[in-house]
Design a protein with these regions (language model features):
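Conserved catalytic-core segment of NTP-binding enzymes
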Residues: 55-162
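Switch II (G3) loop of P-loop NTPases
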Residues: 20-25, 44-60
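Short, basic/aromatic-enriched C-terminal tail that caps enzymatic domains
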Residues: 160-177
Length: 177
């Protein structure tokens, strides 16, 4: 579960949580719940699999990959151009290639999630867009979405950003985070 979130809080918001029932804080190896395959098998589900931005997340993907309909599944890479490993086109491309290799899938699109949490401005979105436009030029992989937190963005969203706008809300992030 995301840091500081409880399963109950998420379920109150209509989100079904599928996670390991092991205490991952003390477990020596990562564990994947068998229920992880449920949304893949039942085509009525709309679901997101958060791989967590590291190699451990590919274990989840390894479990569901054989069941995926590759023609219907998108494999997005979320990019924050203010993170050290994804601050340049070269870094993003390297991370994308590592992710594709580990997952055995091709990235079908980027999500521009360039942010400074509660300090995010229109300039942040423009910076991420500029970096990702160069990545798209080099790889042919398009930007599909631009995500931002509505309450944080007091400025108008810039026009001409690559991708569809995807406004979000802080649901459970504590104000001190």
């Amino acid at each position: 579960l995301p840091c500081g979130h409880s399963k109950e809080e998420l379920e109150e918001k209509g989100i079904q949580v599928i996670a390991s029932n092991l205490d991952t804080a003390v477990a020596d190896v990562p564990a994947v719940s068998g229920a992880m395959t449920m949304p893949v098998i039942n085509k009525e589900y709309q679901y997101v699999v958060d791989l967590g931005g590291n190699d451990v997340g590919t274990l989840v993907l390894g479990r569901i990959k054989p069941l995926l309909d590759h023609a219907e599944a998108d494999f997005f890479m979320v990019v924050n151009a203010y993170r050290p490993n994804t601050s340049t086109p070269e870094g993003i491309i390297e991370q994308m290639e590592n992710l594709e290799y580990a997952a055995g899938l091709k990235v079908t699109g980027f999500i521009n999630n360039t942010n400074l949490v509660r300090e995010t401005t229109a300039e942040c979105l423009l910076h991420g867009d500029e970096v990702l436009k160069e990545v798209t030029k080099r790889t042919g992989v398009p930007v599909k979405y631009v995500s931002y937190v509505k309450d944080v963005m007091t400025e108008e969203i810039p026009e001409g950003l690559s991708g569809e706008l995807f406004p979000m809300e802080f649901n459970m992030r504590k104000t001190w985070m």
